[in-house]
């Protein structure tokens, strides 16, 4: 097969696949945290932050849910209340919702 024909076929497949909407099975899950040793820290000014992002297809739309929590030793026991959002992927502003709404059964998978 000629290299230019092969390249054209690969290019056509790439263009066609980029136009395919996100699959119902699409899932992206990421977590970032510096809270691992927070509870054991003796530093009275210790601070930790944790974020989990879940990107998926829901009712044929791309949705991204974000879980964010910040804990500060100096603020006492009432800090560290998570803030969550559930927003369409193409939106410019996050839509704040309760964490149960944003993560449903996946909320139990978040360990911060």
Curated annotation (Swiss-Prot):
Identify the stretch annotated as signal peptide in this record. 1-19
Pfam families, per the entry = DUF1505
Instruction: Provide the glycosylation site positions.
Output: 59
Give the superkingdom in one word: Eukaryota
Task: Tell me if Glycoprotein is a UniProt keyword of this record.
Answer: yes
Q: Where in the cell is it found?
A: Secreted
Q: Cellular component terms, GO, for this chain's entry?
A: extracellular region
Kindly state which keywords UniProt assigns to this record, in alphabetical order.
Glycoprotein, Secreted, Signal
Family statement: Belongs to the UPF0375 family.
Please identify the protein, giving its name as recorded. UPF0375 protein R05A10.4
């Amino acid at each position: 097969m000629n290299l230019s024909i092969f390249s054209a076929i690969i290019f056509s497949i790439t263009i066609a696949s980029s136009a395919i909407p996100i699959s119902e099975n699409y899932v992206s899950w990421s977590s970032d945290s510096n809270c691992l040793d927070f509870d054991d820290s003796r530093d009275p000014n210790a601070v930790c932050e944790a974020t989990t992002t879940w990107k998926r297809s829901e009712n044929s739309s791309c949705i991204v849910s974000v879980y964010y929590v910040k804990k500060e030793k100096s603020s006492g026991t009432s800090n560290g209340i998570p803030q969550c959002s559930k927003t369409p992927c193409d939106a410019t502003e996050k839509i704040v919702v309760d964490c149960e709404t944003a993560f449903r059964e996946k909320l139990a998978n978040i360990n911060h």
